[in-house]
Swiss-Prot record:
Biological function: One of two assembly initiator proteins, it binds directly to the 5'-end of the 23S rRNA, where it nucleates assembly of the 50S subunit. One of the proteins that surrounds the polypeptide exit tunnel on the outside of the subunit.
Gene3D superfamilies (UniProt xref): 2.30.30.30
Protein name per Swiss-Prot or TrEMBL: Large ribosomal subunit protein uL24
Coiled-coil regions listed in the entry: none
Name of the encoding gene: rplX
GO annotation terms (biological process): translation
Pfam families: KOW, ribosomal_L24
Gene Ontology CC: ribonucleoprotein complex; ribosome
SUPFAM superfamilies: Translation proteins SH3-like domain
PANTHER family: MITOCHONDRIAL RIBOSOMAL PROTEIN L24
Disulfide pattern: none
Family according to the record: Belongs to the universal ribosomal protein uL24 family.
Biological source species: Campylobacter fetus subsp. fetus (strain 82-40)
Length: 77
């Protein structure tokens, strides 16, 4: 069973641990089963994209990766 967290989608949070420590940003998604959140502009990774009809050349995109919910704190106010 997933744990209930106080952080919700759209909340402002501050990263308190990791490479992006100190950044304040908005939560894009909460993954309660994994205990992780995706935060805008935090832990951005480059992902390879295969060529498709929409994107015939393929290439790389920057995508936010999930971080552990214990590494963020909700910003009040």
């Amino acid at each position: 069973m997933a744990v209930k967290y106080k952080i919700k989608k759209g909340d402002e949070v501050k990263v308190i641990a990791g490479d992006d420590k100190g950044k304040v940003a908005k939560v894009i998604a909460v993954l309660p089963k994994k205990g992780q959140v995706i935060v805008e502009g935090v832990k951005v990774a480059k992902k390879a994209v295969k060529p498709t009809e929409k994107n015939p050349n393929g290439g790389f995109i920057s995508k936010e990766m999930p971080i552990d919910i214990s590494n963020v704190a909700k910003v009040e106010g």
